[in-house]
Swiss-Prot record:
HAMAP family: MetAP_2_euk. One of its GO terms (molecular function) is aminopeptidase activity. PANTHER family: METHIONINE AMINOPEPTIDASE 2, METHIONINE AMINOPEPTIDASE 2-2. Residues 1-120 are annotated as: Disordered. Substrate binds at H238, H347. GO terms for cellular component: cytoplasm. A divalent metal cation 1 binds at D259, D270, E467. This is Methionine aminopeptidase 2-2.
Amino acid sequence: MGSKSPEGHRQAPHASNCNELKPANPDPQISQNGSGSADLDRGVIGDDDDDEDAEENGVNTETPNVGKLNQPPFPNLDQVHVTTTDGLCITEKKKKRKKSNKKKKKTKSGALPATELKQTSPPRVLVSTLFPSEYPVGELVPYDCTARTTDEELRYNSRLWDDDFLPDYRQAAEIHRQVRQYAQKELIKPGATLLSIAEGIEDGVRALSGHQGLEPGDFFKAGMGFPTGLCLNHIAAHWTPNPREKDVILDKGDVLKVDFGVHVNGRIVDSAFTVAFDDKYDNLLTAVREATNTGIKHAGVDARMSDIGAAIQEVMESYEVEIDGKVFPVKAIRNITGHDILRYHIHGGKQIPFIKNNNQDKMEEGEVYAIETFGSTGRGFLDDDVGVYGYGRNENMSGANLRLSSAKSLLKTIDASFGSIVFSRRYLERLGVKNYLLGMKNLIDNGIVECYSPLVDVKGSYTAQFEHTILLHSGGKEVISRGDDY
């Protein structure tokens, strides 16, 4: 989810291989490729399974000893010739192995063990059930200036991050991967309504996290990190379907940005991708994807925001795209930025512009960042559009002086159900809240709630976005949201 700069306040990359990095809380048994290696991570495939298969095919899995018959497999013969230790050759009937009729053991509840489970479509199996011990690690990228992570650095990281930090983030990332990959395969198709896509994504996140967010306090345990952004063409960011608005239907000529967040105990994973069905947009998507990967490459402890922004702009603006016979330069959008992420706050205090700038802020060890870029065939500058994307609570403002009863009641619901996490009108109505517009206006007028509008470039232009969340370890960065798709 892009952060507005102070001035303005089906193409996917393959993850690259990298050297192994020792993270703050090392999990050496876990795959670095996310859900793509889930079966191996959960132990579905292993040496024991190979032995059992061999035995079923008549293969002797024991090591031959002196004095024993050497019995190679002969699956199509009734007799085998064997040689004893004294040199005699004899013929024996091949013994037939009885087929095992053992049934798979079930749990007390009658279900198959967790190691036998697969994700469903639509995704409804809890990620915590699929990964009962540890969650997959993101892509680990060591810093160029270090060869190893010292024990002292590991102890320092352990003080920065509590014991739940990495498990929470990795669980949120795995939920994001599984839901978005389902969306890419089953939901995002020409003719689909944007409302059906948004609801499909959000239903998947709630199902895999195990928290529907309908009871007071449940939303704070896990769920959506912010409303699903579904932005078409010149709409770059912050658009989501609202209740009782006309359905928007996805067309095969559209360029769709999909941006959603997942949180577990307030640890928010923010990741986005762009989908286009017409290959004439390929260069636009490639430019933005490569710019995001460039930002990730340059990110790290002590990296300056100015240097990252300059590198992003250089890569993105080296591309041009031909659309319907006209050539457009790809421009880095200059008044929206990447950002750091704090607990229960999608936007922290630091920003990463996509252009060359004078921001001398540095990244620090233990921080979490959303590295994202937006590219456009238009002006490369965004304006607020009509409509509402969502709302965010201003924690610095008290509601003690509110006079309107509807505003007081609505604020109580917001504090109990969302806290500082951005929410949409659909989320309010899902809780059964009605007639809230007047109360919401009063909260906005008093500075207690901030309203977010869609951000657009000029009509007729096309915009694209790619984004990943990274964690800054001592010896390297973990691209926590990296997957096989991008």
